Curated annotation (Swiss-Prot):
SUPFAM superfamilies: Fibronectin type III (SSF49265), Immunoglobulin (SSF48726). May link the intermediate filament cytoskeleton to the M-disk of the myofibrils in striated muscle. May also contact myosin filaments. Also binds beta-integrins. It is found in: Cytoplasm, Myofibril, Sarcomere, M line. Residues 192-217, 818-915 are annotated as: Disordered. Keywords: Cytoplasm, Immunoglobulin domain, Muscle protein, Phosphoprotein, Repeat, Thick filament. It comes from Mus musculus (Mouse). Ubiquitously expressed in all striated muscles. Expressed in all fiber types. Residues 492-587, 620-714, 721-814, 918-1016, 1023-1122 form the Fibronectin type-III domain. One of its GO terms (molecular function) is structural constituent of cytoskeleton. The modification Phosphoserine is found at S124, S142, S863, S867, S1036. PROSITE patterns: FN3 (PS50853), IG_LIKE (PS50835). GO terms for biological process: extraocular skeletal muscle development; muscle contraction; positive regulation of gene expression; positive regulation of protein secretion; protein kinase A signaling. The keyword tRNA processing does not apply. This is Myomesin-1.
Length: 1667
């Protein structure tokens, strides 16, 4: 015997098999199954021989008490149906009597229903479905043999119960027994005759055909002989069992007292929730069950709607609606019949929140949109929704305001009945915020952006719903970058979010901007701001290129906001939009703060305290790994140790270079509080290993295991460039661009598209928010203009290279008007699960009757037979009663709907609950000789309501020709599997499955492949089924399945899971587990994000691996936006809980918690609390029994689920955290520290997070408490939490350990500072120095000591800054202890005193000193300018001189070409080097270098073409070389060389021209009568010609004046006797071919004085004559 599959997992009417109380019953069943092997093969003979008797019995029984029989038969139907199919597999006799068997079975008379009554009663505690009996007047021959009567009972039976009094039931039982006793002998006779004379029977055509086949194969063989012997033995056993059966036909054996198969269980629920109590009772006659509350019978009519009592299929249910505090009571289920009474008890505890709920909301109800209510015209009111003045594709700029809106026209217009208006962006609902505000004015819907950001870019959809009708409209919004403050600076990043927040660090992520400002982005700066302040501080000193960065140095418990700025070579761009505030908290603490109370208010809380253990050094951390590595930082993650004591622990991180064993502590000053740490300042490309140590007050623990070798560098590669850019026309202003996505791209954020007018060379971004997918519509283009496009991908590592430019396309409208908004990338799914509205308005009226709901939607279902004459066909009736209550519909609406259907087809409407979609992937799970077990996958769409069942149809396929469809089940089956019986062996069948919910029956599935009905005898197991995917993330998912129905010859021992990419070939399957796993689930890790996968499961037993299951998938490995995970939290009372939140729940969604993927319903160790879209599962006493994976599934959603693993280490961590919360400590912002004040005072201080007014502090020094006095001053600021202690001076006896102990109510805390050894001496020295400094500053003193500075004129300026001076203060400068300057009348500004030294050189080396003095004291500052200090100064001077050098210039001379540069002045310390074409110049007579004044030159005499090239003058200041370059080639050389030739020729001419070398005086004074001899040397080549001039007239040689020229060099001028007539101006003119020169001289002849006197004394002759 084998329990049918549909009974093992049926939920619709057989929930009892899922109860733990039936495990014992099932084990008995397995034992009986083994013991009844012989009976299995022999029972069919008895069955075939007892058909006639059974028919007579059923006729009599039908006349006597048909109703009683139906109830009794319904209890044995389930097992009977299975037994009848099993009994027929063992012998030829069953085949010979198949016709009679089918005839009897069709009338509700199976062998197991009358045979071995004790088996059916103890093996099947479920209620049995009734079989229809033969009417008394019907003849055997008049009934068709192949017709199967539908098995169902009337609706009244299920609703009102079967009996009204115990007496009637006893009478019916007695009548039934009497009929059996009367027909017992006839049955035995009929069985004997049937076995001997079956060939002569003519009861049906099928029996005749069977006998004819037996006669055909009359020839016996060894097999036939053995089979006949087995039949004979089976017949003997049947006769014995018949005698046993007759012995049981008495009233005493049939009657038995009530027995609870399933007892009601106690429940603890929240107020306003519903609760159901279930129980199942067995007994004969059937017991009557009564429910009691606190021993008072429950009256359903006295409290209408409060209690619902149901009894269906033996399962009794009490439902209490909207529990309140008064429903807390003890409930009793009392079952009674004539044999006795039995009771079962269960308690219901209703709990309420204390101060959590607003009672007014509970009384008044929740405010809902008016459109959800019934309209004045009823549900059938039709609304036409139109959009006028619609918003178009919009363009905005960052910082601007924008408003989207349209006018909504709804007809008919109904007062006080407003539509529901919802806005969506990229498919997600838009919630009101400070950035965006929706508004509805009564006829116009608007969406206003107060400050546009690039995050606001996307496809916006407005959806208006009125009643059950809706309409929607979509358009895209583009946001351009704001104008940069610095021209050429990059645009602002976007989407700044926090990825991983912890106690002291937060990882920030952002998206790179599309515009880089014209130069590549060098990196990003991250700024933080504490919430409540306006101060922004920069988090990183150097720009980071990776779009993720861990921000450290945060204060635990405080909230921060972040922004990001991009930087390129031009400057820093505008900041991004600030992120949402995020708190620096431990994730568990954050989840605790967000969660609801761990338990409802019960009125009393008892707290017990335990002494914590001390002195436990923590163990090593575990699971240390590198979670993220870039060139800028490396993030480590680990798990806390299991051994940690009962106090908080902190961590020290150590690093080590690969190849060395020298471990260095990274965080030497401050230990880490959270189990994560970010390391900076690592050398890129270098390999490291890391480890972590734990520490507490007891000491530092052992190190963890080291990580694998980590090479510092970006692990995430920049994506490759996209390819195949294809533009296509759309509208007059837009173009659709498609591309081939980047290959092997990891963590892809999206794509940026750019457009350029052909020939312009200027690219403009088409989108400022990365889009996913491979298609985008670029708007805002110029009509009739030609454009080209390019695309690049972006991920956290950066932006890819640009793709190749697309082909040019002219912007014009495409034929057909372009593409609809549905083709936008990642936006093709209608927003928020909205129905596509391209077909106009949507809506659907509810079905008007139950028949329409269940049958009218299935066109493939055959119509029911209209009369008994149609029963000749072997068809199953289509009448179904799965839905007990018809769906109501207003009767007044029938006529209008009918009129509408006649006049015009009704518009498509959207019903809140639709029929489900079709199931798919039908497969055969197990096959027998005459039955098969099918499995299928649930529909993708449930229609908004839970699926209540499935209907299966099948048809034969003979010679590839399918037959007619037949129904396999009348009652809907709730499981996704069903066993179909009464099939033909070795026949092919096809199947269809339809799903049903409260809205009706959905469309049938596609026709399955052909399955052959045959006995499976293979040794390996069959395929697993119901493979389900859940918890899909970007790199992991969870796979679940059910074991195969057919386990093979040996039990299943494990499973293998395979996967492959969806697009891969079948030969690329790879296994995920090397060894078989026992669990029926597996978490698959290591998936590639964005890749589509399919999975399959194979079962294995001792014989081998079985057939694979149907494929699960394909599924894309991605983490959907908004995905939330299960988080663990520990509240202040130490209560540990798992929390989950889902913002995508529907009204019918429920949270289902599981442990190791087995539901945890009513677990005594757990308590589940659901409130709205949040759920919490609390551990009552976390222990080793609670280890496992806890998952939470949300029903009626798109597979939303999450899980959390609690292993031994996590359990220890949570228990330690719970202990810490039970015994809290005072949190500190800063530990005890010491600082030196201005006068040398010492301040000890620490800061607590928060102190109450009752906080007390004890000050401990060397384990002794100290108090306020002359030496110590204490102060506590309870508002800021600062605790201080002051000491005037540190003495030697103050060395030791200082401790501040805090007591604040229950919480305690302390902080210790150790000041001993070198640390104390250094602190003491610093205090004394500060004291002396304070004394010094009481008089005139130096605020800044003497220093030097080199000015732009290369002078040296000695300067210092003085303070506290007055007019009487003297300032004296000294050099080498000699006074050089006194400044008595100082009027300098800002207290700056200077001494200027011009043309500084070695002579200025020495010691400089400045002294300040007045009546208050004096101070001095000394500057050493010798040796290295002087050399450093000279280096700076030389550097300034070198920087003052002018550019090299070219000058031509008569000797050659000179290159020169001027400096402010020259020092010998400045080294000058010249090079020619990169080679140093060797100085010769032809090439020389030198310095003349401030000119540094290089002289090239007689230049040649080899002197062409690049000349470099390098001025070396002692540390750095400064170069000046000139190119002496080409035209520059030609011009310089030509000038040199000219100057050279001019020099030659100047040298060889005729000239007077000397000898001639300027003036010759001579006495008259004397001889004048002048000699003059002349020169010229060739020798010059000589001529003389007198008074500018030529003078010729004569006797008086002799002119001679000898040897071409000497000219002689002689006057023999000079007279006054010879006075005058003379000139010597020399001349040759190169030129001439004139030398002038003057000859003055004078008369002696004596002759003048004589002449004066003599009278004039003229006068004498005149006398």
């Amino acid at each position: 015997m084998s329990l049918p599959f549909y009974q093992r997992s049926h939920q619709h009417y057989d929930l009892s098999y899922r109860n733990k109380d039936l495990r014992t019953t099932m084990s008995h069943y397995q034992q009986e199954k083994k013991r009844s092997a012989v009976y299995t093969h022999g029972s069919t003979a008895y069955s075939s021989r007892s058909l006639a008797a059974r028919r007579q019995e059923s006729e009599a029984f039908s006349q006597a008490s048909a109703t009683s029989y139906q109830q009794q038969a319904s209890q044995t139907y389930s097992l009977g149906a299975s037994s009848s199919s099993r009994h027929s597999q063992g012998s030829e006799v069953s085949r010979k009597t198949a016709s009679a068997y089918d005839y009897g079975y069709s009338h509700g008379l199976t062998d197991s229903s009358l045979l071995l009554e004790d088996y059916s009663s103890k093996l099947s505690p479920q209620t049995k479905r009734a079989k229809r009996s033969l009417l008394s007047g019907e003849e055997t021959g008049s009934l068709p043999g192949n017709y199967l009567v539908p098995i169902y009972s009337g609706r009244q039976v299920h609703i009102s119960g079967i009996r009204d009094s115990e007496e009637e039931r006893i009478k019916e039982a007695a009548a039934y027994i009497a009929q059996k006793t009367l027909l017992a002998s006839e049955e035995a006779i009929a069985a004997s005759k049937q076995s001997t004379a079956s060939k002569q029977s003519a009861t049906s055509k099928r029996t005749t055909s069977t006998l004819q086949r037996e006669e055909t194969f009359e020839k016996k063989s060894r097999n036939i002989a053995i089979r006949e012997k087995a039949e004979e033995l089976s017949l003997k056993k049947t006769l014995e069992e018949t005698q046993t059966y007759h012995g049981k036909l008495n009233e005493d054996h049939l009657l038995h007292a009530p027995e609870f198969i399933i007892k009601p269980r106690s429940h603890t629920v929240w107020e306003k929730e519903n609760v159901k109590l279930h129980c199942s009772v067995a007994g004969w006659p059937e017991p009557r069950l009564t429910w009691y509350k606190n021993q008072v019978p429950i009256n359903v009519h006295a409290n209408p709607g409060k209690y619902i009592i149901e009894s269906r299929y033996g399962m009794h249910t009490l439902e209490i609606s909207k529990c309140d505090f008064e429903d807390t009571a003890q409930y009793r289920a009392s079952a009674m019949n004539v044999q006795g009474e039995l009771s079962a008890y269960a308690s219901v505890v209703v709990k309420r929140y204390k101060g959590e709920l607003d009672e007014s909301l509970l009384r008044g109800g929740v405010s809902m949109p008016l459109s959800f209510a019934v309209t004045p015209y009823g549900y059938a009111s039709k609304f036409e929704i139109h959009f006028d003045d619609k918003f178009d594709v919009s363009f905005g700029r960052e910082g601007e305001t924008m408003s989207l809106g349209c006018r909504v026209v709804i007809t008919p217009e109904i007062k006080h009945f407003q539509p529901e208006v919802q806005w969506y962006r990229n498919g997600a609902p838009v919630s009101p915020s400070k950035w965006v505000q929706p508004h509805w004015s009564g006829d116009r819907a608007t969406l206003t952006f107060s400050h546009l950001n690039k995050e606001d870019e996307g496809l916006y959809t407005i959806r208006v719903r009125m009643g059950e009708y809706y309409e929607q409209y979509s358009a895209y919004v583009f946001v351009r970058d704001a104008d940069a403050e610095i021209e050429g600076a990059p645009a602002a990043p976007l989407d700044v979010v926090s990825l991983d927040a912890n106690k002291d660090y937060i990882i920030i992520s952002w998206k790179q901007p599309a515009v880089d400002g014209g130069s590549p982005i060098l990196g990003y700066f991250i700024d933080k701001c504490e919430v409540g302040t306006d101060t922004w501080s920069q988090c990183n000193d150097t720009p980071v290129k990776f779009a993720r960065f861990p921000v450290t140095g945060l204060i635990e418990g405080r909230s921060y906001i972040f922004r990001v700025r991009a930087v390129n070579k031009t400057g820093i761009g505008l900041p991004s939009r600030v992120s949402e505030p995020v708190a620096a908290l431990d994730p568990a603490e954050k989840a605790r703060l967000k969660s609801h109370p761990s338990a409802p208010w019960t009125g009393q809380i008892i707290v017990t305290e335990e002494e914590p253990t001390e002195g436990v050094i923590p163990g090593p951390p575990t699971d240390l790994s590198v979670t993220e590595a870039t060139r800028s930082y490396v993030v480590l993650s680990w798990k806390p140790p299991g051994q940690r004591g009962h106090e908080g622990i902190m961590y020290f991180v150590e690093k080590c270079d690969v190849g060395a064993e020298n471990w260095q502590r990274v965080n030497t000053e401050l230990p880490v509080k959270s189990p994560r740490f970010a390391l900076f300042d690592l050398v890129e490309g270098k390999s490291y290993r890391f480890r972590v140590r734990c520490s507490n007050s007891a000491g530092v623990g052992e190190p963890s295991e080291t990580t694998e070798v980590t090479v510092v560098g970006d692990k995430l590669d920049i994506p490759k460039a996209p390819g195949k850019i294809i533009p296509s026309r759309n509208t007059d202003t837009s173009v659709v661009v498609s591309w081939e996505e980047s290959r092997d791209a990891k963590e892809l954020v999206g794509y940026y598209i750019e457009a350029s007018v052909v020939g312009s060379g200027k690219w403009e971004p088409c989108n400022n928010n990365p889009v996913k997918g491979s298609r985008f519509t670029c708007h805002g283009l110029t009509t009739a203009q030609s454009y080209i496009f390019r695309v690049r991908a972006v991920n956290a590592a950066g932006l890819s290279e640009y793709s190749q430019d697309s082909e040019a396309i002219e912007v014009k409208a495409a034929i057909g008007g372009g593409v609809s908004p549905d083709v936008w990338p990642q936006l093709s799914d209608t927003p928020g699960g909205l129905t596509d509205s391209r077909g106009g308005m949507n809506g659907a009226s509810p079905p008007t009757s139950q028949k329409d709901a269940l049958l009218g939607s299935n066109p493939n279902k055959p119509s029911p037979p209209s009369s008994p004459s149609s029963r000749g066909q072997k068809e199953v009736s289509t009448v179904s009663e799965s839905v007990q209550e018809p769906l109501s519909s207003p009767p007044q609406e029938a006529a209008p709907e009918e009129e509408q259907s006649q006049s015009e087809p009704p518009k498509k409407k959207k019903d809140p609950v639709a029929v489900p979609s079709a199931p798919y992937d039908i497969t055969c799970l197990e096959s027998f000789r005459d039955s098969m077990v099918l499995g299928w996958k649930q529909p993708d769409t449930t229609g908004g309501a839970e699926i209540t069942g499935y209907y299966v149809n099948y048809r034969e396929v003979v010679g590839e020709v399918p037959g007619k469809w037949r129904e396999a089940n009348i009652k809907a089956v709730s499981d996704a599997a069903y066993k179909i019986s009464n099939l033909k062996e070795n026949t092919l069948y096809q199947f269809q499955v339809s799903a049903m919910n409260i809205a009706g029956l959905g469309a049938p599935s596609t026709v399955s492949e052909c399955f052959k009905c045959e006995e499976w005898t293979i040794a390996v197991p069959g395929p697993p089924h119901s493979v389900k995917l859940s918890e899909v993330r970007k790199n992991s998912l969870v796979l679940q399945w059910k074991p195969p129905v057919y386990s093979g010859r040996t039990p299943v021992t494990g499973y293998f899971v395979d996967l492959k990419e969806a697009s891969a070939k079948d030969d690329q399957w790879r296994g995920l587990n090397e060894a078989a796993i026992v669990n029926k689930y597996l978490r698959v890790q290591g998936l590639k994000e964005g890749t589509s996968y399919v999975f399959r499961v194979r079962a294995v037993n001792q014989a081998g691996v079985g057939k694979p299951s149907d494929l699960a998938g394909p599924v894309v490995a991605e983490t959907r936006p908004g995905t939330k995970e299960v988080v663990v939290s520990v509240d202040d009372d130490g209560v540990i809980s798992l929390n989950f939140e889902c913002d995508q729940m529907t009204p019918k969604s429920e949270f289902v918690w599981s442990k190791d993927y087995v539901p945890t319903e009513d677990s005594p160790r757990l308590e589940v609390e659901n409130k709205g879209d949040k759920t919490k599962m609390t551990f009552k006493d976390l222990g080793t029994d609670d280890l496992g994976t806890y998952s939470c599934d949300v029903t009626d959603t798109d597979g939303i689920a999450s899980s959390y693993l609690i292993d031994e280490e996590e359990m220890k961590r949570l228990l330690a955290l719970s202990q810490e919360h039970k015994f809290p400590t005072v949190p500190t912002k800063s530990e005890l520290a010491v600082e030196i004040l201005e006068k040398g005072q010492v301040r000890f201080w620490m800061q607590a997070e928060k102190l109450s007014s009752n906080a007390k502090v004890s000050y401990i020094f060397n384990e002794k408490e100290i108090f306020e006095g002359p030496k110590y001053k204490m102060h506590i600021d309870r508002n800021t939490g600062i605790i201080e202690m002051f000491m005037e001076k540190l003495q030697d006896e103050d060395e030791g350990t200082y401790t501040f102990q805090i007591q604040d109510g229950k919480a305690t805390g302390h902080s210790t500072l150790v000041l001993i050894g070198d640390v104390y001496k250094k602190l003491q020295k610093e205090a004394e120095f500060q004291r002396q400094e304070w004394i010094r500053k009481q008089g005139p003193h130096f605020a800044e000591y003497l220093s030097w500075e080199v000015t732009g004129e290369c002078n040296v300026l000695l300067k210092c800054k003085v303070a506290n001076i007055k007019k009487e203060t003297h300032i004296v400068w000294y050099k080498d202890e000699r006074e050089i300057s006194v400044d008595e009348k100082h009027d300098f500004k800002d207290g700056i005193c200077t001494l200027l030294i011009t043309e500084f050189s070695k002579k200025d080396a020495g010691f400089y000193e400045v002294i300040l003095k007045d009546d208050r004291g004096k101070d001095k500052s000394r500057l050493k300018l010798v040796d290295e200090a002087f050399q450093d100064l000279m280096t700076e001077v030389c550097k300034k001189i070198a920087l003052s050098a002018t550019d090299l210039k070219i000058q031509s001379t008569a000797e050659g070409i000179r290159l020169y540069s001027f400096v402010c002045y020259y020092l010998d310390d400045l080294k000058v080097n010249w090079s020619h074409n990169g080679t140093g110049i060797k100085y010769t007579d032809r090439v020389k270098s030198g310095v003349t004044g401030e000119q540094i030159w290089l002289q090239i005499n007689e230049p040649t073409p080899n002197d062409k090239g690049k000349y470099v003058m390098e001025l070396f200041d002692g540390k750095t070389g400064h170069q000046k370059t000139v190119d002496l080639s080409g035209q520059a050389f030609d011009e310089a060389f030509a000038e040199f030739q000219r100057l050279k020729q001019a020099a030659i001419a100047e040298k060889n021209r005729a000239r007077v070398l000397g000898g001639l005086p300027d003036v010759v004074t001579i006495q008259e009568g004397k001889a004048l001899n002048l000699t003059c040397n002349v020169w010229g080549d060739p020798p010059p010609e000589v001529s003389w001039l007198k008074n500018e007239k030529p003078l010729t040689s004569d006797d008086h004046c002799s002119l001679k020229f000898e040897a071409g060099k000497t000219a002689f001028f002689t006057i023999s006797g000079v007279s006054t007539a010879d006075s005058g101006k003379y000139g010597l003119v020399v001349k040759n071919k190169y030129g001439s020169e004139t030398s002038d001289f003057t000859v003055s002849v004078f008369i002696p004085e004596e002759e003048l006197r004589k002449g004066a004394m003599e009278p004039p002759k003229g006068n004498q004559k005149s006398k």
